[in-house]
Structures are given as C-alpha cells and as structure tokens.
C-alpha cells in the first residue's frame, strides 16, 4: 500500500472551478489561490442564505487511542460514498495546525483513499488563515503592551493580563516567558507566555462568527486583562476591534478544495477539541448546508469533547442541528478500553471487545440525550478478526444502534457505501428533535455539573480555590449566562488519561476558568491539559523533506 502522500500525489486534480459546479458555485463566486484552492466570496454566501438547509451529518468517535480513530478519514470517505450513491454532498472539515503536523501527526487531511487535496498545501500554509489568525492575535498583544508603555490610561494591572501570545507550532519552551526586558524603551517588563494558534480565542471567534459584522462584535468583546480594581478590560476599550477584523477579512471566507473522489469540501478553521471547541467554521458548515442536500462535518476527538461542544456551543449558531451522528470506533481502541496493552492489540480478544464496548455504549447513550439518531461506523483494520467484528455487531444490536463496517482508507468511496446507505436510512426513519443539554440561564456550576454527570458519567464536579473565586466573579460580570467549554484529556471520560473504558466513580476537578467572552463561552481547565503542546522525542518533521523540483516528501 502506498503512503498517504504517495496516493495524494498520484491523483490528477481537477480545477476547483470545475469541482464546485456540482453544488451551484460559479467561477465568479471564487477567489482563487492557484488552480485547486479557493475562497468563497461573501456575495455567494449571502445569496444562498435563503436556501432551505439540507441534511447535516456529524462524525465523532469513541475516546481515541494515541493514534486516533480515523474520524477525518471516515468523514471524507462517507462524503465520497454519499456522492457515489447519487447524493448532492459537501464536506466541512477543520484545517490542520502546523504544530501537530510537524510534531506527532505528520498530516491531517484524511488518509489512504479518503483524503482532501491538495494534501501538502492543506497541511502546510494552505491559504494563510493560520497566519492571519496568529497575526491578529499577536497584534492585540503588541497593542496591549504599547498601551502600558504609553501611560496605561485604562489602568490595566500588568500582573493580570490574561491575553498570551500565540504561535502555530509546538514549542514548550515558550509556555512561560518574560517580555519588556532590556531597558525602559523596551516596554513594561511582565510575565507572558505563548499558546498554540488553534487555542487562540481569535480562532474560536473566526469559527463562530456568521459574518464580518459579527466577527468585529465578537473581537470587541474579548476580555484581555483586569484593572487594579479587578474590573475586566475588553478589546473595545482599546478601540482596536476594527484593525483586528481588517487583518481577518479574508481569513473568515471559507476555503474550498476537493476530495480524491471529487466531492467539494470546505476546509476552514481549526480549533482543538481538548482545549477549545473543536469544530470547523459556522460559515463553512452553514453555507454547505444551503448548497448541498447532505453535509458531512466532524468534531474533534471523542464525542465527550468535540460532539458535546458541537451540540452545545456550535449548533445554536447553525441554521439547524445534526440530522444524524456517526460514531467512529475501531476494534483496537475497544480492546484498549477493555484492558489490552498497546503491544497486544493485534491479537484476537473478543472478551476485551465486550469489556471495551462500555465506552462506545456510553457515547451512543450520550448522543441520544440530544434526541439525534446514531449510527456506529467500524473503521476496519487488517488486524480485525471476523469473531471480533461479529461480537461488536451483536453488542450494537443489543442497544438497537445501526452499525456498519467501513474500509474507506483502503477502498475510498466504495468502502463507505454500506455506511452511507445506513446513515441515509437512519435520517429517513428517525427524525432528530434536538435538545440542548443545558439552558443559557443555568449557572456555570450547573452547566459543568450537567456535562460531568450526564456526558462523562462522573460522580460530581469539584472546584479548586481559584475556580471557586472565579465562579463568583464571573457571575458578577454576567458571564455565567455563557456555555462552557471543557479543556480535558481526550483519552478518557474522566480527567485522568489512564482511566479507560466507561468509569463512573470519579470526580472532575476544575482548576481554573478562562473567559472567552468574544467567542461566547467559558473554558474550564481540568487536569494537566496544555495550551501549548511540546514536540515528541522523534518529531514527524524529521521524516519530511522537499525534492529539487519542489515535491513534498514525508507528510505521511
């Protein structure tokens, strides 16, 4: 079998102007970035706003193994399979962060014969959105430090600035830094730090904004610091939201590319799901819904993180809720949740599949709490045995959830036809009646308790000393009406990554709350979740290269 990049480079690309005709987009509606990438114009986005939205399919997963469960690959393969069975389909995915591409992942545009193309461009600089977001974010940092230097008219306490700088790389050495050193002309010395760009509130705002006006309003509402009297300071107090929106005026436009099979795909925005809300842009998803009969989108990591945030944070900003949710599972992950060591996952173990099924079962039950039909997709691997597959199918039948094998990595669209038909049938047979997990009027404590007990299966939520004080403070500022965004390990329902399966006798401890008032949610930090990742001992970058003719090598 060829590598992902070898497969991607072997596929003859069609001009993007030809690809998008399938969903009623003309060449004049595009802002081209070469022949195979484009941004969609605001004029086209506005012109389809009155269209009735099509069906929305959300792809999520069980709690993943370190290698991931193939959610993006499955999303692409499902979209291609829907196209193959005659459905007018679009795909709406997140764009990769360069940090993990250079770090552990090596690439994030699908895999095998289920990829979005041009894969190398998407994984690297693409259309420059990440750079624009990084620039806007750091421009705000520079403007804050300049305000301190120029007299600090707003009375900002330099010790209480909560706006860090960002970089789209994994660089642990920048987590905590001191700025303003050297001499009085170099600024006011203070502690600072760097997050990865995909953890930036600017990224979250770009992905939740519905247009430029909304983008500017959300940027204005960012909390950047506290004064000496502990009152919050907003971007609007600095009067720079217009400048930030100007930097982002092109980045907010959704990017269009194609799959190997020729399905039109929006790839736009990329917040992480363990430290942010983990969904692609509202603009991309909403526009796809109004252009296609079926839109396939995904939410990061497992359903306890990405799907929960999609349904509680993103869905209220969309024209409709998902009509079906596909939960991707692998037998290797189920066996790991059933207690099998990583080194032994290739050996048949039906008992471990039965034990690990508790993890999948809880995810199915959780999605059903939102009143949305569920389909399970088994992402097939060559090490899967007939006995293991049969056990999993029997277990799914016991909880009355449709389940289909999918081999889109190896077979592309052909490997996802059974899954596509199952999803279409689920939508036709059972109408979604979306119900949110909590109400806006619920307190932050009530919202967090609902997520911990209803979604994670935990016993209770505990608050550290800092978080306890913040609960009172945020209520005084009126921020308790916002939804919550949990920053938690993706490997477990709990905040302990080693607690696999479906644990229940555990508490989740919230150590700190972070206001993201521009994005419109409050981040709750648990465990040791880092907002600036580090590189592994052997980074994927060590295998990457470029030939003399400019061909990328080693992007998996």
From Swiss-Prot:
Gene3D superfamilies: Domain 2, N(10)-formyltetrahydrofolate synthetase, Formyltetrahydrofolate synthetase, domain 3, P-loop containing nucleotide triphosphate hydrolases. SUPFAM superfamilies: P-loop containing nucleoside triphosphate hydrolases (SSF52540). PROSITE patterns: FTHFS_1, FTHFS_2. GO terms for molecular function: ATP binding; formate-tetrahydrofolate ligase activity. ATP binds at residues 65-72. GO terms for biological process: tetrahydrofolate interconversion. Keywords: ATP-binding, Ligase, Nucleotide-binding, One-carbon metabolism. The keyword Nucleotide-binding applies. Its EC number is 6.3.4.3. The keyword Nucleotide-binding applies. Pathway: One-carbon metabolism; tetrahydrofolate interconversion. It catalyses: (6S)-5,6,7,8-tetrahydrofolate + formate + ATP = (6R)-10-formyltetrahydrofolate + ADP + phosphate. Belongs to the formate--tetrahydrofolate ligase family. This is Formate--tetrahydrofolate ligase. The lineage of its organism: Bacteria, Bacillati, Bacillota, Bacilli, Lactobacillales.
């Amino acid at each position: 079998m060829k590598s992902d990049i070898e497969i991607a480079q072997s596929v003859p690309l069609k001009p993007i102007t030809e690809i998008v005709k399938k969903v009623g987009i003309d060449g004049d509606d595009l802002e081209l970035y070469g022949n195979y990438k484009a941004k969609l114009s605001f004029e086209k986005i506005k012109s389809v706003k009155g269209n009735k939205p099509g069906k929305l399919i959300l792809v999520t997963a069980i709690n993943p193994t370190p290698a991931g469960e193939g959610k993006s690959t499955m999303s692409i393969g499902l979209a291609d399979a829907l196209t193959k069975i005659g459905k007018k389909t679009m795909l709406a995915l997140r764009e990769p962060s360069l940090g993990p591409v250079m770090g552990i992942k090596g690439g994030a545009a699908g895999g095998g014969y289920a990829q979005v193309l041009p894969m190398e461009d998407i994984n690297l600089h693409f259309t420059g959105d990440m750079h624009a977001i990084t620039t806007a974010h750091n421009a705000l940092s520079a403007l804050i430090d300049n305000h301190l230097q120029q007299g600090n008219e707003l009375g900002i306490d330099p010790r209480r600035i909560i706006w860090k700088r960002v970089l789209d790389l994994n660089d642990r050495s920048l987590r905590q830094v001191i700025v303003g050193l050297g001499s009085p002309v170099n600024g006011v010395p203070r502690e600072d730090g760097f997050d990865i760009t995909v953890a930036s509130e600017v990224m979250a705002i770009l992905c939740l904004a519905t247009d430029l006006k909304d983008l500017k309003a959300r940027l204005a509402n960012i909390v950047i610091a506290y004064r000496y009297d502990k009152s919050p300071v907003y971007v609007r107090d600095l009067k720079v939201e217009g400048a930030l929106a100007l930097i982002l005026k092109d980045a907010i436009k959704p990017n269009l590319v194609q799959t190997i099979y020729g399905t039109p795909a929006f790839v736009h925005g990329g917040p992480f799901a363990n430290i942010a809300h983990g969904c692609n842009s509202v603009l991309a998803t909403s526009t796809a819904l109004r252009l296609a009969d079926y839109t396939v989108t995904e939410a990061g990591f497992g359903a306890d993180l990405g799907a929960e945030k999609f349904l509680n944070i993103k869905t209220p900003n969309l024209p409709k809720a998902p009509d079906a949710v596909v939960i991707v599972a692998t037998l290797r992950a189920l066996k790991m949740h059933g207690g099998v060591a990583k080194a032994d996952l290739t050996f048949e173990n039906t008992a471990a599949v039965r034990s690990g099924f508790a993890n999948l079962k809880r995810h199915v039950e959780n999605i059903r709490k939102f009143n949305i039909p569920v389909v399970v997709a088994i992402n097939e691997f060559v090490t899967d045995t007939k006995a293991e597959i049969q056990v999993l199918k029997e277990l799914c039948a016991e909880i009355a959830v449709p389940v289909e094998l999918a081999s889109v990595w190896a077979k592309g669209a052909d490997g996802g036809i059974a899954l596509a038909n199952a999803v279409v049938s689920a939508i036709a047979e059972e109408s979604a009646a979306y119900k949110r997990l909590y109400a806006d009027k619920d307190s932050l404590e009530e919202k967090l308790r609902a997520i911990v007990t209803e979604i994670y299966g935990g016993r209770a939520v505990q608050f550290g000393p800092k978080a306890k004080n913040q609960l009172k403070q945020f209520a005084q500022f009126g921020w308790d009406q916002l939804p919550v965004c949990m920053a938690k390990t993706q490997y477990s329902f709990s905040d302990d990554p080693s607690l696999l399966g479906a644990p229940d006798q555990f508490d989740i401890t919230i150590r700190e709350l972070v206001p993201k008032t521009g994005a419109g949610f409050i981040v709750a930090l648990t465990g040791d979740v880092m907002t600036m990742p580090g590189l592994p001992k052997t980074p994927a970058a060590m295998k990457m290269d470029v030939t003399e003719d400019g061909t990328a090598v080693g992007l998996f």
